[in-house]
């Protein structure tokens, strides 16, 4: 009787929004003035600045910044920050949702790295997987796959098997896994380790094909729901008070957690292969 109260509901929101008269397909206009911003650095290209300036004219924008190393990217500049109100921009979040780095510090003396180099190289060759189609022969039962979220959203249900298959893999591009020396220049009470040198595992990767397909789907959905002038089309957003906005936000967070789970699996396999115990992890 009152679809408005269900508009942002994860299960019934899509039906409610279909029942409501909607103006979501009307082309949105950019503001004449930019939202407040700050630029940190002197050698940032005009292209990167222009990308931020366009984003700052979105009706949802409340502020932005460019970091000293900012440069032009896909949509938003790399090293750019954009704050928006009650909305999310799928293309701004990016195609590799949750891409991150993860460092594990082990209790193995760092001298072992050079003394048994072949052992560590062999562990990397046998227990890491790179490329679009590489995967492990065995898969760990991770708690993330027990989450109800996979059954609540159709695209997540469809992608679950892919996510399981790609668990613990790194993909391609600039992603990597390596052993190396970690030096703490002072005692670090936050991670509970004293000053010294340690053996570490460092990895860089994201949410694999699982996150990429989520991103591609909702980028298309946002473009349909939020038409924008040509120069700003990549900034199409989803309102977080709507079903679609909530749906993407939920899927995005699951993809981020999946990326973290992949790092955990990669490090677990390597620690099991070389021995030792985990002393600290930074992600």
Outline where the language-model segments fall:
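Short acidic, Gly/Ser-rich segments with clustered Asp/Glu that frequently serve as metal-coordination loops
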Residues: 72-73, 100, 206-211
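Glycine-rich, flexible loop motifs
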Residues: 5-63, 87, 91-92, 97-191, ...
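Gly/lys/ser-thr-rich phosphate-binding loops in alpha/beta enzymes
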Residues: 76, 88-90, 208
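Active-site nucleophile and cofactor-binding loops and adjacent substrate-binding regions
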Residues: 67-73, 94-95
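Short, flexible loop/turn elements at secondary-structure junctions
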Residues: 43, 69-71, 180-183, 205-207
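Short, low-complexity S/T/E/D/G/P-rich linear segments that nucleate or cap local secondary structure
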Residues: 1-2
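Short glycine-rich or small-residue beta-strand-to-loop segments that form or flank ligand, phosphate
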Residues: 65-66, 200-204
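Glycine-rich loop at the start of a catalytic domain that most often binds anionic cofactors/ligands
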Residues: 77-85
């Amino acid at each position: 009787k009152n679809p408005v109260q269900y508009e942002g509901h994860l299960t019934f929101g899509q039906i409610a929004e279909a029942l409501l008269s909607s103006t979501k397909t009307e082309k949105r206009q950019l503001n004449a003035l930019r939202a407040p911003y700050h630029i940190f650095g002197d050698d940032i290209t005009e292209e990167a600045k222009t990308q931020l300036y366009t984003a700052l004219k979105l009706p949802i924008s409340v502020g932005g910044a460019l970091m000293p190393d900012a440069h032009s990217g896909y949509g938003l500049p790399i090293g750019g920050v954009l704050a928006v109100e009650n909305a999310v921009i799928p293309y701004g979040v990016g195609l590799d949702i949750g891409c991150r780095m993860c460092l594990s510090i082990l209790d193995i003396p760092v001298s072992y790295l050079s003394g048994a180099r072949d052992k560590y190289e062999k562990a990397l060759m046998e227990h890491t997987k790179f490329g679009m189609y590489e995967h492990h022969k065995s898969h760990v039962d991770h708690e993330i796959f027990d989450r109800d979220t996979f059954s609540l959203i159709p695209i997540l249900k469809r992608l679950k098997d892919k996510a399981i298959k790609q668990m613990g893999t790194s993909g391609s591009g600039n992603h990597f896994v390596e052993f190396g020396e970690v030096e703490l220049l002072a005692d670090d009470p936050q991670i509970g380790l004293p000053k010294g040198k340690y053996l570490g595992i460092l990895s860089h990767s994201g949410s694999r094909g699982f996150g990429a397909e989520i991103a591609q789907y909702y980028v298309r959905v946002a473009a349909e729901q939020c038409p924008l002038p040509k120069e700003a089309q990549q900034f199409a957003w989803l309102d977080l008070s709507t079903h679609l906005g909530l749906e993407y936000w939920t899927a995005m967070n699951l993809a981020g957690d999946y990326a973290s789970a992949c790092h955990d699996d990669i490090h677990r396999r390597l620690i099991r292969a070389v021995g030792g115990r985990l002393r600290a992890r930074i992600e």
